[in-house]
């Protein structure tokens, strides 16, 4: 037999500190917490091995391939400041390990097996560098930011949305009525909640019809283009595409998908359909916190956001920095830039471990949603800038006078903030004053200001 049987240390093969990374490599930064007694080099090498070519023992079929050409390599390890026994392990994967245009295959390879590994107490994928050669195998977002603005004819400000509540239990006609009132009041979009699919109290086809009616009625009355994110997520891909086809036949501008529960394969198929048929695609990240909330185990959301840009979506929820859900400001802004910009420099302060060049893949609009109201408007305008969607669910429907006045209040607040910013005023310092002054001319906004109290915001 021409090979030496038996178990050998991973680090002998997979820890290569002298390796020069190639432009075509996919690079990963893992936060590794080894079990007591396991050296960090062995833990990092184990991750590289188990997520590429390795298995636990030497096998004779290793001799039939060129391991050097195909193996993942742990090329650098650094300890995490302020954390005991935590390391960042950098791993380089040769491009040939991955199927072109498949986020599913990329994740199956990189995170598929290694997270249950005994030598590790915990493991978190913090960032990925997707090389241009691999980016180019993806279609990416169906349309992107510029095309969306042109389709909607809306420029120079963030877009406004609202999730229809209560999310479950309304009949289709009442649901459509709520949509109409919000759009009529001045919002650009309304939204199906992520778990509104096709339940007994409201089947999808009825909802699509009544929402389309609401959209057209509001468009006629306001002279603006309106949309409602019709959730096409379904139990099978075929059913999902059937719903997308019906939305296209109704002539509505945008549909929606839950990309993590629906899965990357379904999402990429839907994104291709949307580009071919002129539909915008709104993406909800339901289930993300299961994967990304633990600080030392799982996958950071910036990786899920990059994966979505590759798989395809025109909007994605990205946290608010100011509302009811968790999100640290610099880190959030880091992945907001990763969604929108063509080229992003490495910036460890914002959690960006690698420079990322998207080579002409269209951008994705970040959606701020969750516990926000009119007093947050100056902060949101300042933090997210024009290329974003600000979504006020309770902050619209919770208005004491109803949905349409709630929508008016949000639109007036937004226009006031954009105007103040364009005049060179400091939204951080004068935010509350700007909202108060706008409220003098808008009873709807004044009423909203009463219900939700001013916030102290430092930014």
Swiss-Prot record:
The basic functional RuBisCO is composed of a large chain homodimer in a 'head-to-tail' conformation. In form I RuBisCO this homodimer is arranged in a barrel-like tetramer with the small subunits forming a tetrameric 'cap' on each end of the 'barrel'. Its EC number is 4.1.1.39. Belongs to the RuBisCO large chain family. Type I subfamily. It is found in: Plastid, Chloroplast. It holds the Pfam family RuBisCO_large_N. Mg(2+) binds at residues 191, 193-194. The keyword Transcription does not apply. One of its GO terms (cellular component) is chloroplast. HAMAP family: RuBisCO_L_type1. The lineage of its organism: Eukaryota, Viridiplantae, Streptophyta, Embryophyta, Tracheophyta. InterPro entries: RuBisCO (IPR033966), RuBisCo_large_chain_AS (IPR020878), RuBisCO_lsu_C (IPR000685), RuBisCO_lsu_C_sf (IPR036376), RuBisCO_lsu_fd_N (IPR017443), RuBisCO_lsu_N_sf (IPR036422), RuBisCO_lsuI (IPR020888). Substrate binds at residues 113, 163, 167, 285, 317, 369. This is Ribulose bisphosphate carboxylase large chain. The disulfide bond which can form in the large chain dimeric partners within the hexadecamer appears to be associated with oxidative stress and protein turnover. It comes from Roridula gorgonias. CDD domains: RuBisCO_large_I (cd08212). One of its GO terms (biological process) is photorespiration. The active site is at 165 (proton acceptor), 284 (proton acceptor). The modification N6-carboxylysine is found at residue 191. One of its GO terms (molecular function) is monooxygenase activity. RuBisCO catalyzes two reactions: the carboxylation of D-ribulose 1,5-bisphosphate, the primary event in carbon dioxide fixation, as well as the oxidative fragmentation of the pentose substrate in the photorespiration process. Both reactions occur simultaneously and in competition at the same active site. The modification N6,N6,N6-trimethyllysine is found at residue 4. Its cofactor is Mg(2+).
């Amino acid at each position: 037999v021409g090979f030496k049987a038996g178990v050998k240390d991973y680090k002998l093969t997979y820890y290569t500190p002298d390796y020069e990374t190639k432009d075509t490599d996919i690079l990963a930064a893992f936060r590794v917490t080894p079990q007591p007694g396991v050296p960090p080099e062995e833990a990092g090498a184990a991750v590289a091995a188990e997520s590429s070519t390795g298995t636990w023992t030497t096998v004779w079929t290793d001799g039939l391939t060129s391991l050097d050409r195909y193996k993942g390599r742990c090329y650098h390890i650094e300890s995490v400041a302020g954390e005991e026994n935590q390391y960042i392990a950098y791993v380089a994967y040769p491009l040939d390990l991955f199927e072109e245009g498949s986020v599913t295959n990329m994740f199956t390879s990189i995170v598929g097996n290694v997270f249950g590994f005994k030598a590790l107490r915990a493991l978190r994928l913090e960032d990925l560098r997707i090389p241009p050669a691999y980016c180019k195998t993806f279609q990416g977002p169906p349309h992107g930011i510029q095309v969306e603005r042109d389709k909607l004819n809306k420029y120079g400000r963030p877009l406004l949305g609202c999730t229809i509540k209560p999310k479950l239990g309304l009949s289709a006609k009442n649901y459509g009525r709520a949509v109409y009132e919000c759009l009529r009041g001045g919002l650009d979009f309304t939204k199906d909640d992520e778990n509104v699919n096709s339940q007994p109290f409201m089947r999808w086809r009825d909802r699509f019809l009544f929402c389309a009616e609401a959209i057209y009625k509001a468009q006629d009355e306001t002279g603006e283009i309106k949309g409602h994110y019709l959730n096409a997520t379904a139990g099978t891909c075929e059913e999902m595409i059937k719903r997308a086809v019906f939305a296209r036949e109704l002539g509505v501008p945008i549909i929606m998908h839950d990309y993590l529960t629906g899965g990357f394969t379904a999402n990429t198929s839907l994104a291709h359909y949307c580009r071919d048929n002129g539909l915008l695609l709104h993406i909800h990240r339901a289930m993300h916190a299961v994967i990304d909330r633990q600080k030392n185990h799982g996958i950071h959301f910036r990786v899920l956001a990059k994966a979505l840009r590759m798989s395809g979506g025109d909007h994605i929820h990205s946290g608010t920095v100011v509302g009811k859900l968790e999100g640290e400001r610099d880190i959030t802004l880091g992945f907001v830039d990763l969604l929108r910009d063509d080229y992003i420099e490495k910036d460890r302060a914002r959690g960006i471990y690698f420079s990322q060049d998207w080579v002409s893949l269209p951008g994705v609009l970040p959606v701020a949603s969750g516990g926000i109201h009119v007093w947050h408007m100056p902060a949101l305008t300042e933090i997210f800038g024009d290329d974003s969607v600000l979504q006020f669910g309770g902050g619209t429907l919770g208005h004491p006078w109803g949905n349409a006045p709630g929508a008016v209040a949000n639109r007036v607040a937004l226009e006031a903030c954009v105007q103040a910013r364009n005049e060179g005023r400091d939204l951080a310092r004068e935010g509350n004053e700007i909202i108060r002054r706008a409220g003098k001319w808008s009873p709807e906004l004044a009423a909203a200001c009463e219900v939700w109290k001013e916030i102290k915001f430092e930014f």
